Amino acid sequence: MPRTRLKIHVAEPFDFSRLNGGESDLLGWTAQASPAFSDWVVHLDRPAVVGEEEFDKVKISSRYAGETVSKLLEGFGFTAINICYPRRDEDGRTYWHFGMVGNVLLAPEGQ
């Protein structure tokens, strides 16, 4: 699948930009930009931090029931999303932790 460039604006947690060099936007790519996928894993161009945890990918899903992230591909400017990042439990297993909300849009050319 081709890679689709995305720009994710993190609206909450409110101090996200403070922890990430003044930036509240994440840039990255996904190979899952298709209606076939309800959630998209986005590989970030640079790592991000929430609390004391650093991560280099996030999983995004639609914020509202009945909507899909793929509506972004149908000409909508942006869509509201839930944002999860990977964490490890006490047994060392990785899971997706819901910790942020925001919006996603197709990244402008050159970003």
Predicted region positions:
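Structural detector for short beta-strands of small beta-barrel domains
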Residues: 6, 21-33
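Amphipathic hydrophobic-ligand
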Residues: 20-25, 63, 79
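A structural detector for beta-sheet-dominated domains
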Residues: 9-11, 43-45, 61-63, 84, ...
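OB-fold/S1-family single-stranded nucleic acid-binding modules
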Residues: 91-111
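Basic/aromatic-rich interaction segments and small domains that mediate binding to polyanionic partners
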Residues: 13, 29-55, 79-91
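Beta-strand/loop nucleic-acid-binding surfaces
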Residues: 53-69
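Short nucleic-acid-contacting surface segments enriched for D/E, G, S/T with interspersed K/R
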Residues: 67-81
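Short boundary/loop segments of OB/S1/cold-shock single-stranded nucleic-acid-binding domains
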Residues: 2-20
